[in-house]
Design a protein with these regions (language model features):
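Acidic/histidine-rich, surface-exposed loop or edge segments in extracytoplasmic proteins
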Residues: 64-77, 154-161, 238-243
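Acidic, polar low-complexity linker/tail segments
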Residues: 19-69, 75-82
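DG-centered beta-turn motif at the end of beta-strands
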Residues: 72-74, 178, 191-205
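N-terminal post-signal-peptidase region of extra-cytosolic proteins
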Residues: 85-92, 176, 217-225
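N-terminal Lys/Arg-rich, disordered targeting/topogenic segments
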Residues: 1-23
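Von Willebrand factor
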Residues: 63-189, 194
Length: 276
């Protein structure tokens, strides 16, 4: 009887040790499953972001988060120092653009103020994460974006160094054309920035400032006023003010104030003007 009792006790121990629940193994499986699930969700979200992005503009298909219009007046050439300063300011402005902000660069080089296609028009794809680099082309887009706008800016500056002085300088007409192309169909709540690189001396049949600024109230009553109207979409405006020796009697605070009044009337706000 004593021996049977010992065998029974031994069998019981084997049952407890060998047939118990393998909690460590279950925890490992559960942890691995959670990791794979999280990875799957991340892949899904990144791929969803890629599918929601326009492959041509790199903007979200729902629209850009912001638009920055850069208009460079090429009716007269810039000197080397002005061109380099303007280039630095444009590059700085583009680099400051937030993710999904579209940058449009136009060159105003036509006598009637009409514009061709933008030299550059892309959205900032944002800063790629480590996972983006592994499973998507965000890093490549970021590199192409920077190389693209730098090439566009360099191309633009090369052109304005070589242009011949034009007979007209239709700044208002060029701005209207650029604004229409860039953001006329934009949702009302999307912010807009405008950077103008110009001497701002309007010279066209609409208005001639080369001999003097004139009173803004007088311009509002003129025949050219109706042709100057444009909705600037609550834009925040910066002027890179290109100074010229032949316009010393025109380019002054009164001239900048004239443009500030014009922008106010067109639903925009002049934030700053810096002479170069």
């Amino acid at each position: 009887m004593s021996r049977r009792s010992r065998r029974s006790s031994s069998g019981s121990r084997r049952s407890r040790n060998g047939g118990g629940t393998p909690w460590g193994a279950i925890a490992k499986v559960a942890g691995g499953g959670a990791f794979l699930a999280a990875l799957g969700v991340t892949f899904f979200l990144v791929n969803q972001k890629a599918e929601a992005t326009d492959p041509t503009t790199w903007c979200n298909r729902a629209g850009p988060a912001e638009v920055h219009l850069i208009l460079l007046d090429a009716s007269d050439p810039l000197d080397g120092v002005q061109a380099e300063t303007a280039r630095a300011k444009v590059v700085s402005a583009i680099r400051a653009a937030p993710e999904n902000a579209r940058v449009d660069i136009f060159l105003a080089d036509r006598g009637d103020g009409s514009l061709g296609e933008p030299i550059f028009s892309k959205c900032n794809p944002g800063v790629p994460t480590a996972l983006d680099a592994a499973i998507s082309d965000v890093e490549k887009k970021k590199r192409d974006y920077e190389q693209g706008y730098l090439a566009a800016v360099d191309e633009t500056m090369a052109k304005v160094l070589q242009v011949e002085p034009a007979k007209t300088s239709p700044i208002i007409e060029s701005l209207r054309s650029a604004a229409t192309r860039s953001f006329s169909r934009l949702a009302g709540d999307v912010p807009v920035r405008i950077t103008l690189i110009s001497d701002m001396v309007q010279n066209s049949p609409m208005l001639k400032q080369s001999k003097g600024i004139g009173d803004f109230a007088t311009f509002k009553k003129s025949a050219g006023w109706s042709s100057s109207l444009v909705d600037l979409h609550h834009a925040r405006i910066s002027i890179v003010y290109v100074t010229r020796a032949n316009y010393r009697d025109v380019q002054n605070n009164g001239h900048i104030n004239w443009w500030s009044q014009y922008f106010d009337e067109m639903n925009g706000t002049l934030l700053e003007s810096e002479a170069i």
